[in-house]
Amino acid sequence: MGRVIRGQRKGAGSVFKAHVKHRKGAAKLRAIDFAERNGYIKGIVKDIIHDPGRGAPLAKVAFRDPYRFKKRTELFVAAEGIHTGQFVYCGKKAQLNIGNVLPVGTMPEGTIVCCVEEKPGDRGKLARASGNYATVISHNPETKKTRVKLPSGSKKVISSANRAIVGVVAGGGRIDKPILKAGRAYHKYKAKRNCWPRVRGVAMNPVEHPFGGGNHQHIGKPSTIRRDAPAGRKVGLIAARRTGRLRGTKTVQEKEN
């Protein structure tokens, strides 16, 4: 079967440790407190910074602690249109303005939001990548649930108490600009993880990959492989139910949750 292939070598390594040395910190909403539940709290955008390994910029927002005589600085995912010196309001009674943080239950239907909480108090999990946004579709006052459309197109029912930032995540259109040079890809993935460059299996020799070898680059066997194949052969489309392009009239697959 030849050498130990790339997939086997990856499995034998240590547990992946993220490249976080130069990162600025975790982008989260404020920890929910009495001020946000019943009124609002005012903060000011001190700085908009780049975070290595992340497409979207981050906003440093300074809040006055409602319980102690000190200031707290939070890192928010920056919404498009915010600027340094802008006041940001967080809470149930905050106004519906770009950059403010409100519960989705208080927002009108059709509102564009980002950094949405999946569960109340988890400080933002959905629609956080650059240019992404979710849309508030409908409210159910009886069950206190809100339906939102996620960037993938799927629709999700979440609690109306979940908070979100009003607006679209900044940095949209980032992937429209082509990388053009290998050097740019090198620096991009150096900040993220060791997954570049990736040599294709058909470009290898037969000892290095099941798809390697031949007088021209071709797989020479089915690209699908059974689930219980040995590790050195388990490459390609593993236990694929189907292959090929999805054809038909259905463009957005709506998942009902």
UniProtKB/Swiss-Prot annotation:
Keyword annotations from UniProtKB, A to Z: Cytoplasm, Ribonucleoprotein, Ribosomal protein, RNA-binding, rRNA-binding
Region of interest (Disordered), ranges: 207-231
Entry annotated with the keyword Ion transport: no
Subcellular location per the Swiss-Prot or TrEMBL entry: Cytoplasm
GO BP field: cytoplasmic translation
Disulfide bonds: none
SMART domains assigned: Ribosomal_L2 (SM01383), Ribosomal_L2_C (SM01382)
PROSITE patterns: RIBOSOMAL_L2 (PS00467)
Single Gene Ontology MF annotation: structural constituent of ribosome
A GO CC term attached to the entry: cytosolic large ribosomal subunit
Cited Pfam families: Ribosomal_L2, Ribosomal_L2_C
Principal localisation: cytoplasm
Subunit details: Component of the large ribosomal subunit.
Function: Component of the large ribosomal subunit. The ribosome is a large ribonucleoprotein complex responsible for the synthesis of proteins in the cell.
Family the entry assigns: Belongs to the universal ribosomal protein uL2 family.
Protein's UniProt name: Large ribosomal subunit protein uL2
Protein source organism: Xenopus laevis (African clawed frog)
